[in-house]
């Protein structure tokens, strides 16, 4: 990976270890969990621009040339879905707090802000550097996931150690539910008598 600062953002040139046939300029490619647009493609190498907003929400602000990253091309609708839907719109970063062996797996403990963990539930999903993982346990400022040998070998998680930073994206469903419930709460005072949800009420609230 090569890096060049550009107008408060960053231009990254990434070499993939897989064939990019079928990828075109303008396509989205997930880099360490961030959805980025390919602006140049040459063989197995592609170039992306990272905006200041993405830099502020990601580990890219501390990226170094030669760093290994996770890559995934965008899902084609109608294709097979393994794991959960990951948008590539990062919520922020976390830190590896510890790693413990557990049979054939490793338990990763991550520290993360409450603004992120509040949307997690036990046995729910979270994307760590773009990797879809199941939340084993979650507290106010930390959470844990189990990583099998294949995942550790095929991704950057196999190289992580305590203190390393990771990109995080929570399951978007929780955020939608929270916003919907907040809107319902604000609308309560304006609700027609006896719960009459009529055409006027729906139109007033954007339906």
What role is predicted for each listed range?
Residues 1-207:
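Conserved loop->alpha-helix
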């Amino acid at each position: 990976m090569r890096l060049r600062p550009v107008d408060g953002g960053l231009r990254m040139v990434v070499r993939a270890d897989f064939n990019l046939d079928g990828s075109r300029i303008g396509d989205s490619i997930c880099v360490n969990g961030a959805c980025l647009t390919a602006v140049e493609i040459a063989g197995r190498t592609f170039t992306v621009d990272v905006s200041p907003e993405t830099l502020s929400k990601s580990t890219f602000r501390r990226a170094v040339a030669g760093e290994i990253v996770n890559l995934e091309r965008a899902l084609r609708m109608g294709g097979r879905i393994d794991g959960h839907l990951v948008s590539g719109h990062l919520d922020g970063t976390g830190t590896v707090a510890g790693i413990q062996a557990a049979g054939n797996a490793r338990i990763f403990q991550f520290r993360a802000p409450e603004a992120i963990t509040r949307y997690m539930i036990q046995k729910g999903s979270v994307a760590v550097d773009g990797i879809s993982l199941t939340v084993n346990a979650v507290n106010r400022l930390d959470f844990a996931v189990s990583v099998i040998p294949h995942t550790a070998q095929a991704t950057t998680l196999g190289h992580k150690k305590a203190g390393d930073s990771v990109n995080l994206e929570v399951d978007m469903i929780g955020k939608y539910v929270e916003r919907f419930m907040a809107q319902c709460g604000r609308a309560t005072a304006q609700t027609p008598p006896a719960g009459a949800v009529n055409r006027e009420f729906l139109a007033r609230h954007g339906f």
